[in-house]
Amino acid sequence: MFYNDYMQSDFNNFQLLTSQADFDLEDEFTSSTNPPCLTTKSPVSTVPDIFWAKKSGGGSTPLLKTLLTSACEKDCYYCPFRAGRDFRRATLKPYEMAKIFSQMAAAGLVQGLFLSSGVIGGGVRTQDKLIDTAEILRTKYDFRGYLHLKLMPGADKEQVRRSLQLASRVSVNLEAPNQQRLERLAPHKSFLDELVQLLQWANEIRQNLIFDKGQRKPSLVTQLVVGAAGETDTEILKTSAYLYNHLQLSRIYYSRFSPIPNTPLENLTPENPLRPLRLYQASFLIRDYGFSPSDFEFDQTGNLPLQQDPKTQWAQNHLIYQPVEVNKADYNLLLRIPGIGPKTARKIIDFRRKNKINSEADLKILGIPLDKVSSYILVNGKMINQQLSLW
């Protein structure tokens, strides 16, 4: 075991907190009941759930996702931790959390930590406890792995600064795209003054922080609840574009609303899982492909159509009758073609500096999926299916 009998009470609280943490930033992780790095001889039932965060370059990292406390003084309508809801709660002190996590890391069970908390005694006091935990891990236990810290509503600017110095990533749960929608979820929170302000501070501070050579600046992320407040995709994507373009967020998570028993929203209908999928697709087009919210087609309710992904829909509306000459299109136009992403677009540009794209073999070398691009591109002035028939 990575804990002993003297730690049993702390560990029981730890297990409970970890099991309750699934609600927060749920889309960042995929869980495994028997992860391959689980080499301890302890029974699997004694080990808290370990989650696998996907790396941008492929592969995944085992992370622990947990809370300092599941007690909370906030009464957000959608949240399982809301004040007054009847369920078993638990709390750990910063040194208790740091000790248990460091032992899990030493045992090879985890390589990173995502730490959040319910709010008790205000945002400043709660943020202090998160920072204390991170400082113990970084200094006493010399932990140099991935650390994701939540920024609490009401935290002050110096706490944001210290969190950025300690963490690999920080996050603020906006939950809604604007104040009007937030009032339906958390009527006692201020969208601009309590939540967006934290992200603005974080972006400003990290531009001026001095990091060690090779150390990456901490990334910023947020989460929006989809389907609980009558918000439209138009609203969500306008806010998402602001967060990407002005505050340089790395990722926005769209959490599908699923009603929690014994909350004010328990009788609402769960959101269709296709809706957040379309939002993710549109979000990545804004972040990585140069799209803006005005490029998307919305239905009468202000939402993205569910039957087709937004990039294909844009191409159907704009490229089907005006296909793109692949030998002449600039980088930004290439990104608009279904099947071509940033990496492939750069390959095309590099290839064209020395050669001309003339054949199916050239397209295959560049990794261009013919089935996806054939309706939208020209090769030397001819549709690809016509050209291929001559080869």
For the regions a language model picked out, list residue spans one by one.
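Flexible, acidic/Gly-rich N-terminal and inter-domain linker regions that tether
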Residues: 1-71, 369, 386-391
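Conserved AdoMet/S-adenosylmethionine-binding subsite of the radical SAM
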Residues: 98, 121-291, 296
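Long, highly charged, low-complexity intrinsically disordered interaction regions
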Residues: 263-336, 368, 372-391
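Residue-level signature of tetratricopeptide-repeat
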Residues: 351-352
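Canonical Radical SAM [4Fe-4S] cluster-binding loop centered on the CxxxCxxC motif
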Residues: 66-95
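Short, charged beta->alpha transition segments
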Residues: 64-67, 95-106
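Short Fe-S-cluster ligation motifs
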Residues: 100-119, 282
